[in-house]
Amino acid sequence: MTENKKRSFATETIHAGAIKDTYGSLGLPIYQTSTFIFENAEQGGRRFALEEEGFIYSRLGNPTNDALEKKLAVLEGAEAAVSTSSGMGAITSSIWPFIKAGDHILACATLYGCTFAFLNEIKKFNIDVEFIDMTDLEEVKAHLKENTRIVYLETPANPTLDIIDIEEVVKLAKKNSKDTMVIADNTFATPYLQNPLKLGVDIVVHSATKYLNGHGDVIAGFSCGSKELMTQVRLVGQKDFTGSVLSAHDAFLIFRGMKTLEVRMKQHVANTKKVVEALQKHKNVEKVYYPGLEDFKNHEVAKKQMKDYGAMVTFEVKGGIEAGRCVMNNVKLCSLAVSLGDAETLIEHPATMTHSTYTEEALKEAGIAPGLIRLSVGLEDADEIIEDLNQALDLI
């Protein structure tokens, strides 16, 4: 391979960010330290003044975390990335530095429950926050204001899988004001399936707990974008506001997990398509929601901006919430648990679990029905996942 040739996604998941260790270690070294020694007082001064690159204190940067951040930046097509100790750490660290009292935030109505709760909490600081249906571009246009500082979106959205036209929302936001930033949560898609930065988004956030790590054993997050914005996220959002710093050991685990991201995502998606087909055929399933279905709202948008349609599926069963509980209480292979993107298939009830922070009215506005079930399709044999779901559905 020539030096200037761009490497494939699969190759970068393995090699991007790799450190040439003093001892020749193939694996990423874990720098388990809180602080770093300066050669002299002058060097310490230069590093604090940002006149010299180097490490100071692990809350501000660590070589293990740095390697991980470089890997994600390459995969997302970003100049830089910041790792955090949770997805909410990434989201809050990416919002706090850029807002002040009197600003307006426009967010999609269907969001991860804790993101929704956070955006409601900051209203007490005189931040005007509005939640709208961003799948409707006319709604976006109508609600943008002169003081709109941030447009915040998830696509596919949690849990309804709503697809928002990233490129068109960015155009509207930038036309509204050069000071309007667009932040996109790319957790459900991962950089393998979607790259919001290439569509004009300013900052992309992730819960790395999910597909990026992929093994259900770490809580972590990422923010990525330009070097200028990531400096603000790290040195203001993370350092001064949230203190949400990822441990070096967890950074090592995610670095290792990300090496198989493409392989895992291919299998997740392949399994999901089989599960979707089976759910559509079951007599006790009322409706299946999946961006890959041709009758799914904004299917064409998903087709345009995503490489494939992801590994999350939601469905409603006949009989409402009690029937849904019957299904969840009777699965044997699937695990009744929140989170997603694990090797295991996870099933949960958004209205009473992940989105319990939503009021009844907000649930209705977000399109989260009382009987909606969310399924994160894992890496087990697809036929065995289907068999388990069918036997539980048969009990309704």
Where are these regions (language model features)?
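Conserved N-terminal alpha-helix of the aminotransferase class I/II PLP-enzyme fold
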Residues: 40-89, 114-121
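PLP-dependent enzyme catalytic core of the Aspartate aminotransferase-like
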Residues: 149, 175-176, 264, 345-396
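A common structural junction motif
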Residues: 241-242, 330-339, 392-396
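Short, well-ordered beta-strand elements within core beta-sheets of diverse protein domains
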Residues: 253-263, 311-318, 374-378
